[in-house]
Amino acid sequence: MASKDVKFAGDARARLLSGIDTLADAVKVTLGPKGRNVVIDKSFGAPRITKDGVTVAKEIELSDKFENLGAQLLREVASKTNDLAGDGTTTATVLAQSIVREGLKAVAAGFNPQDVKRGIDHATTAVIEELRTRTRPIATREETAQVATISANGEVEIGRIISEAVQKVGKDGVITVEEAKGFETELDVVEGLQFDRGYISPYFVTNSEKLIADLENPYILIHEKKLSSLQPLLPLLENVVKSGRPLLSIAEDVEGEALATLVVNKLRGGLKIAAVKAPGFGDRRKAILEDIAILTGGEVISEDLGIKLESVTLSQLGQARRIVIDKDNTTIVDGEGDADAIKGRVGQIRAQIEETTSDYDREKLQERLAKLAGGVAIIRVGGSTEIEVKERKDRVDDALNATRAAVEEGIVPGGGTALARAAEVVARLQFHNDDQRIGGDIVRKALQAPLRQIAENAGEDGAVVAGKVLENGAYNFGFDAQIGEFKDLVAAGIIDPTKVVRTALQDAASVGSLLITTEVLVTEKAEPKPAAPPAGADLGY
């Protein structure tokens, strides 16, 4: 077992604070509309330029193991906030640094760490309640764009694109962010249910210019097994030909004789047909096929359910207004499923999202929910260089997460104002003893830290700006750091999602109050490495 290095009391806390300050000072320069960029050296490829707090935090590893403990614990604050709210990581870091710094001063002055922690927890709960009371729901498309613009560092174009995407796919829709191949940032909205399987054979193409199979008012056969022989399908195919409508076959695979026969019939013009492989694998494939069946009003043809291909009728097939298939994707537009059945399926998927503990499963369930209830939008981020594209993509991700949070929980005035004004609530709180009162004072001071930092990053005196904001009694009155003016922030479109502000404070207080109660640090001792043999030494060969 490796030997350990141990630090106690004041020495331990000083090293911890040094690591926290190093990471926080690197992260907090990015806060606000006039925050600066951080350039990160990568072991491979070009350096990364970013204004995203959590990206900076994740890259910092300190050589001193005791200081690195502090940096790692503060990094946890940023990561947790990012996981829960998707934005607000720099605000959380600034709050945590202030709480830890003031808290360690209180402990050094002889106050009881556990009571100080209780005071911090009590004050944090009161502030979160105040934020919820002051929240108002996001009401207009313009407000959605404003939230996104603020989070994207004031880039109006990003705000407009995200607002448009949210408008088109709804709150249950999925919005993904990708890197574009050109200079422009653009929005691509997928109409209908799309899955990532294209036509099995290019002979199914109906439009040779666009290389797509375009089926109008088709029937849809949804089969979970492979189709190797057409014999069981013949009665159904005859009925489809009589109806004069096209047919899409979705199956695990179509191969051999079955594929050859379908292609020959398609080329002769007797049967308008296309075939695609079923999306997904295993249980997920079964679930997606069931989704498609419910959306199109059909049934999944499965021997497990006692349904055989020979006995399938037209009434068991799905139907849609249109289906478009290219070499990579299939899109079903306006499925003719029963609205109540679709609503029931959506409720079922929502319940599964609530229950699952796996991030991967949650992401896949949300994709399925979007395809049934909302839609899918893709934001393609462009730029002149790869470095610029990556930096913009970071900001688009933050803006998108902030917008989702605003739709979910509402908004409060931005620019650090909502937190600074919540300090009044802490001042009115009752505490059991003086040590807990000190914990409340620590939170009260920390609540001004984001507003001060935003002002300082804009070249102003943070204390003076905070004083002017709090002198004015109007709740929405604050500092617009972009142009250096005091105004009604909500009217000016400077707003923050309540969820982001709340999560930042909760995570900062949680980790910050635990750090205050730290008395001992234990790390592994660095083992001295054996010296390399001198060049040209006799190695005994």
From Swiss-Prot:
**Main location group:** cytoplasm
Q: Which Pfam families match?
A: Cpn60_TCP1 (PF00118)
Top EC group: isomerase
Q: Which InterPro entries match?
A: Chaperonin_Cpn60_CS, Cpn60/GroEL, Cpn60/GroEL/TCP-1, GroEL-like_apical_dom_sf, GROEL-like_equatorial_sf, TCP-1-like_intermed_sf
CDD domains associated with the record: GroEL (cd03344)
What compartments host this protein? Cytoplasm
Q: Which PROSITE patterns match?
A: CHAPERONINS_CPN60
Q: What is its EC number?
A: 5.6.1.7
Please tell me where ATP binds in this chain.
30-33, 51, 87-91, 415, 496
Question: Which Gene3D superfamilies does this UniProt record tie to the protein?
Answer: GroEL (3.50.7.10), GroEL-like equatorial domain (1.10.560.10), TCP-1-like chaperonin intermediate domain (3.30.260.10)
GO cellular component terms listed in the entry, alphabetical order: cytoplasm
Keyword annotations from UniProtKB, A to Z:
ATP-binding, Chaperone, Cytoplasm, Isomerase, Nucleotide-binding
Which reactions fall under this protein's catalytic activity?
Answer: ATP + H2O + a folded polypeptide = ADP + phosphate + an unfolded polypeptide
One GO molecular function term?
unfolded protein binding
Might you name a Gene Ontology BP term for this protein? protein refolding
Q: How does it assemble?
A: Forms a cylinder of 14 subunits composed of two heptameric rings stacked back-to-back. Interacts with the co-chaperonin GroES.
Q: Which HAMAP family match?
A: CH60
The family classification in the record reads: Belongs to the chaperonin (HSP60) family.
Q: What does this protein do?
A: Together with its co-chaperonin GroES, plays an essential role in assisting protein folding. The GroEL-GroES system forms a nano-cage that allows encapsulation of the non-native substrate proteins and provides a physical environment optimized to promote and accelerate protein folding.
According to UniProt, the name of this protein is Chaperonin GroEL 2
**Gene that specifies this protein:** groEL2
